[in-house]
């Protein structure tokens, strides 16, 4: 019954804000048409608003879960029009706070301690309130030196899980209906969108997980002059309550306060871009909700000329697969070099596009997207916009994107927005390019490869005894002709020649890999004998021969 009433309310809101065109061509359209006479007409003020603004207002009226839905939907620029996405980014996740005494009870249940024991003080008036949780100021009991440390406690809203479950169930039903009946369902992919929203909200409901995210990010940026991450107080953290060191700073979009504090905004903007690319390509762990409200600037007067960001809210973090990380970095470098052919090839090699796509068509599409940008002043070029438009054009060729890449698009857009607000003349290309080049150089250096091999030494040692037997078995199959093909035509002759070349490449690659394994084993065993630097000479010889074999295999593509 509650679901029916909730669906009825959603229908009324859709009609009042004139959003029924979104369901055009579906059975829901007929029901909405029948209900239209019984719903008050939109005011003249609403009627003149753009479709994006009307959708934003409707989501705000439907409540905090739908606000969160709109915020997540704003990241799906591959699915919704740009004007609607821009409007949805204005959604503010601010709601009326719940009772402070209720927050106190939730903290006590979560920690298994009375608040008066766990904390020296706990302010029942929240510092901030959002749809999932709210934040309270507190102090810890005195430490050995008698110091009472200031902290903030993030507390989940009461009954929030039940409310989210009910709204998500309703969204799943609506998504199924749209998928079955909407003429553009294959492009919109409604069930995929709802599943993504459900996953994001589920992650935000576990504050212990958020604490783990903060802890990992802090470890990556320990001692950095570019980014500070508050410490997690694990003794006072549980699934429904997260305690963090209290930090003080200036919101990154409060330009007046930044100027009053004497902050070097130009240096700060460049740091923001560098931090983002380092998180993505060095750490593979990036803050994926990096809007201005979650990025503060350290207000310490001593940091005016060397400013530092402070990260807040770690509910949504992003990670890429190693393949996506590599292909994305190569894509950016191809954009820098205006190598449209390479862009097209990378989209196919990454598995984002079907292998039967014509590379020359994709190359022409990439050129049509990028060339107009290259005619603009450098301060107006947006890598995020180029990437989004590339992916949007590629949709015509059945583009398949992982949710993490979509999350990265949104984060890059936010970071560029923050950077340009701090420094309108920020040349993102000039800042990003050397960072990418350095990270790629370090990532694929021989020293790093050897270090990674040594980390995997136990696994290599476990499987190494089986390798000769497996290689011998495979080669024996080739010699005995178990994969021979009876050639009957010139096309099959060409295929046979290709297979022979492939066979030679595979054998060369296996040999090269084996030699690299030997190099790693020798490096890990620290044998007696000559050393070059800290690496045994025989490791250099074996590793060099293995690298040469792999290079030969690669060149024979």
Swiss-Prot record:
What is the E.C. number?
2.7.-.-
Identify the stretch annotated as signal peptide in this record.
none
- Matching InterPro entries: ABC1_dom, Kinase-like_dom_sf, UbiB, UbiB_bact, UbiB_kinase
Q: Name one GO biological process term.
A: ubiquinone biosynthetic process
Q: What is its main location?
A: membrane
Membrane topology per record? Multi-pass membrane protein
Q: Which cellular components does GO assign to this protein? A: plasma membrane
| Domain Protein kinase, residue spans | 121-509
Query: Is-annotated flag, keyword Cell membrane?
Result: yes
Q: Which terms are listed as keywords in the entry?
A: ATP-binding, Cell inner membrane, Cell membrane, Kinase, Membrane, Nucleotide-binding, Transferase, Transmembrane, Transmembrane helix, Ubiquinone biosynthesis
Query: Which pathway is recorded for this entry?
Result: Cofactor biosynthesis; ubiquinone biosynthesis [regulation]
Residues of the active site: 289 (proton acceptor)
Pfam family example for this protein? ABC1
What is its EC class?
transferase
Sequence intervals crossing the membrane: 506-526, 535-555
Q: Where in the cell is it found?
A: Cell inner membrane
Keyword Cell inner membrane, does the record have it? yes
Q: Report the sequence similarity comment from the record.
A: Belongs to the ABC1 family. UbiB subfamily.
Q: According to its UniProt entry, what is the function of this protein? A: Is probably a protein kinase regulator of UbiI activity which is involved in aerobic coenzyme Q (ubiquinone) biosynthesis.
For this entry, the protein name equals: Probable protein kinase UbiB
């Amino acid at each position: 019954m509650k679901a029916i009433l909730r669906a009825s309310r959603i229908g009324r809101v859709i009609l009042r804000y004139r959003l029924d065109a979104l369901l055009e061509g579906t059975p829901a359209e007929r029901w909405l048409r029948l209900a239209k006479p019984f719903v008050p007409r939109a005011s003249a003020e609403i009627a003149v608003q753009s479709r994006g603004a009307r959708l934003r207002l409707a989501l705000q009226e439907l409540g905090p879960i739908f606000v969160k839905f709109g915020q997540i939907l704003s990241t799906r620029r591959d699915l919704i029009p740009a004007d609607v996405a821009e409007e949805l980014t204005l959604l503010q996740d601010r709601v009326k706070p719940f009772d402070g005494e209720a927050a106190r009870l939730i903290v006590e249940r979560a920690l298994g301690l009375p608040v008066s024991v766990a904390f020296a003080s706990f302010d029942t008036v929240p510092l901030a309130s959002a749809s999932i949780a709210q934040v309270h100021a507190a102090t810890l009991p005195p430490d050995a030196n008698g110091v009472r440390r200031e902290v903030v406690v993030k507390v989940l809203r009461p009954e929030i899980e039940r409310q989210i479950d009910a709204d998500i169930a309703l969204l799943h039903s609506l998504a199924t209906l749209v998928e079955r009946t909407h003429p553009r369902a294959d492009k919109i992919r409604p069930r995929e969108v709802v599943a993504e929203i459900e996953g994001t909200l589920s992650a935000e409901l576990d504050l212990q997980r958020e604490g783990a995210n903060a802890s990992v990010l802090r470890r990556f940026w320990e001692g950095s002059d570019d980014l500070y991450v508050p410490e997690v107080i694990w003794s006072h953290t549980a699934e429904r309550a997260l305690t963090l060191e209290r930090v003080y700073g200036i919101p990154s979009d409060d330009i007046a306060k930044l100027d009053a504090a004497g902050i070097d905004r130009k240096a700060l903007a460049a740091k923001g871009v560098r931090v983002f690319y380092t998180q993505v390509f060095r750490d593979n762990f990036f803050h994926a909700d990096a809007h201005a409200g979650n990025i503060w600037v350290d207000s310490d007067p001593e940091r005016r000329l060397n400013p530092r960001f402070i990260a807040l809210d770690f509910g949504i973090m992003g990670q890429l697969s190693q393949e996506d990380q590599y292909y994305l970095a190569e894509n950016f470098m191809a954009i820098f070099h205006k190598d449209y052919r390479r862009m097209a090839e990378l989209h196919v090699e990454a598995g984002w596009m079907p292998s039967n796509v014509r590379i020359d068509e994709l190359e022409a599409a990439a050129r049509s997207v990028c060339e107009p940008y290259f005619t603009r002043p450098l301060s107006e070029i947006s890598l995020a916009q180029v990437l989004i438009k590339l992916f949007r054009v590629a949709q015509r060729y059945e583009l398949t994107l992982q949710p993490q890449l979509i999350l990265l698009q949104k984060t890059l857009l936010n970071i560029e927005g923050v950077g340009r607000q701090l420094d309108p003349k920020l040349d993102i290309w000039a800042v990003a390019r050397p960072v990418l080049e350095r990270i790629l150089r370090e990532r694929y250096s021989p020293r790093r490869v050897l270090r990674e091999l040594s980390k995997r030494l136990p696994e290599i040692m476990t499987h190494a005894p089986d390798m000769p037997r497996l290689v011998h078995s495979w080669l024996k199959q080739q010699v005995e002709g178990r994969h021979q093909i009876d050639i009957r035509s010139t096309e099959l002759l060409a295929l046979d020649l290709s297979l022979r070349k492939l066979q030679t490449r595979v054998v060369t690659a296996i040999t090269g890999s084996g030699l690299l394994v030997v190099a790693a084993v020798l490096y890990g065993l620290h044998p007696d004998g000559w050393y070059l630097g800290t690496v045994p000479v025989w490791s250099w010889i074996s590793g060099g021969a293995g690298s040469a074999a792999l290079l030969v295999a690669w060149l024979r593509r």
